[in-house]
A protein has these predicted regions:
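Short alpha-helix in the alpha/beta-hydrolase fold that links the catalytic acid
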Residues: 222, 231, 245-253
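Short beta-strand/loop motif that positions the catalytic acidic residue
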Residues: 229, 235-237, 241
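Active-site loop/oxyanion-hole signature of alpha/beta-hydrolase fold enzymes
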Residues: 69, 73, 82-120
Length: 296
């Protein structure tokens, strides 16, 4: 029952992004970028070219823009902001397997393609795990971390939950065939109501891959090397979170030397549902993690 409840909350959260979204404004245009040896993915690149760079890494079942569009206009005032659709999400790379390691390497490959040397990696939920892995696998490229509503491991670390995720994926394969897949051109149409735009973004990720996502999340565990993280790190704790419970988020605060804690009075979808309360502490968190690069 706990497993089913966790899944139900996750689906409600994903649909909540769509049905009660934060009003969209100044959504940046994007383009497909082909990463040599890896594949094509959808990318947005906005803000001052000479400003410190922040990569925004999204949560599961969303896209780079669906997860992060509320914060981009404010960030663009003093940061160059990059979003990307991760593997099998939206217009992300299609690969035989889904791996957070691969997602982390995609971030650095994209930075190479864009001519970006060093950057702050900010991630929400799944994106927080990817951000940690970007530092772990490419420490020389990361100037700071911003970890939001995430932890050092995910619930599918538990084999029972991972098995449930696979069963759910099989069920959703049939459901996914009945759902309309938005035409690519319509994903970029921001003239429609935010709910319509958000629904198109949501439907661009195949629900049939839920099992693969669960497997990819389940193998992630940073607890053994958290103490090695040596860049400015901000942790944004969602205090009403029922997906990544606050106690698990606090492990990042306690485990990373010098980590600064920020708080948002919201649940696991706070980046969009209640974004007006998420944006201020998130911007503060980015500023704190980027202090070194800004001063330099």
């Amino acid at each position: 029952m706990i497993v089913r409840a966790d899944f139900a909350r996750g689906m409600v959260r994903a649909f909540g992004h769509v049905l009660r979204p934060y009003p969209a404004r100044d959504i940046p245009a994007g383009t497909m970028v082909d990463l040599p040896g890896r594949g094509p993915l959808f990318v947005t690149d906005s803000g001052p070219r000479d400003a410190p760079v922040v990569f925004l890494l999204h949560s599961v079942l969303t896209t780079g823009l669906l997860c992060w569009y509320p914060v981009i206009p404010e960030l663009n005032k003093r940061y160059r902001v990059i979003t990307l659709d991760q593997r099998w999400h939206g217009r992300g790379i299609r690969s035989p397997e889904f791996s957070l390691d691969d997602c982390a390497d995609d971030v650095v490959a994209l930075a190479d393609e864009l001519g970006i040397d060093r950057f702050t990696a900010a991630g929400f939920s799944m994106g927080g795990g990817i951000a940690q892995l970007v530092w772990r696998r490419h420490p020389q490229r990361v100037t700071g971390l911003v970890l939001c509503s995430t932890g050092p491991y995910f619930s599918t670390r538990d084999p029972r939950l991972r098995a449930q995720s696979r069963r759910t994926g099989r069920v959703l394969t049939a459901v996914d065939k009945l759902l309309p897949r938005p035409r690519v051109g319509r994903l970029d149409d921001t003239s429609v109501h935010t709910t319509v735009w958000a629904m198109r973004q949501f439907l661009s990720t195949p629900l049939s891959h839920m099992g693969h996502f669960g497997d990819g999340l389940g193998v992630f565990d940073s607890r053994e090397w958290l103490a090695e993280i040596d860049v400015p790190t901000s942790v944004v704790v969602s205090t009403r979170d029922r997906v990544v419970e606050p106690a698990r988020q606090e492990l990042l605060v306690d485990g990373i030397a010098g980590a600064r804690r920020f708080e948002v009075d919201g649940g696991h979808a706070c980046c969009v549902l209640g974004a007006q309360w998420f944006i201020p502490p998130f911007i503060e968190a980015v500023d704190a993690a980027s202090e070194v690069s800004i001063e330099a």
